A protein has these predicted regions:
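Short, well-structured N-terminal submotif of metal-dependent ribonuclease cores
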Residues: 1-28, 40-54, 124-127
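Acidic, PIN/NYN-like endoribonuclease modules and their adjacent C-terminal/linker elements
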Residues: 59-64, 92-127
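Alpha-helix capping/helix-boundary segments
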Residues: 32, 71, 91, 108-109
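Acidic catalytic patch
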Residues: 3, 27-32, 60-80
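Alpha-helical solenoid repeat architecture
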Residues: 86-87
Length: 127
């Protein structure tokens, strides 16, 4: 997450909720790690890359879900049906095969049948 990202306050609150155990049953696709790696690599931010990945993989109470053949097949189908990019498709396929819920500010997930998107901004606004 960029330091100046407008979603940083919401992300910080969500991460704190996961780390503290207040938010339970939270998982993330390992594709998110790949996405972060590509983002930093493409900008040649190698030192920041290691720090970011190290931070993410050590978040307490966060389950990392690996890419499986079933997730990859579902992602490919979602890409064709909903015209979403590979990473969005991996995240959506993971959610569909788990609990059909995704935590994201991206409205692209609203058009994917069977997924309920939870906006982290709304979580931030709750006491």
């Amino acid at each position: 997450m960029k330091k100046e990202d407008r979603f940083k306050p919401a992300a910080d609150r969500v991460l704190e909720g996961i780390n503290s155990g207040r938010m339970q049953g939270v998982y993330a696709s390992s594709a998110a790690l790949q996405e972060v790696i590509f983002w930093f690599y493409n900008r040649r931010l190698m030192a920041e890359l290691v720090d970011a990945v190290n931070f993410l993989v050590h978040i307490e109470n966060l389950e990392w879900v690996g890419l499986t053949p079933e997730i990859c097949l579902n992602a490919a189908l979602l890409m064709g049906e909903y015209d979403v990019g590979p990473f969005d498709a991996y995240h959506a396929a993971t959610a569909i095969l788990r609990d059909k819920t995704i935590l994201s500010t991206e409205h692209i997930y609203d058009k994917i049948k069977g997924i309920e998107r939870i906006d982290p901004i709304e979580i931030m606004e709750k006491p």
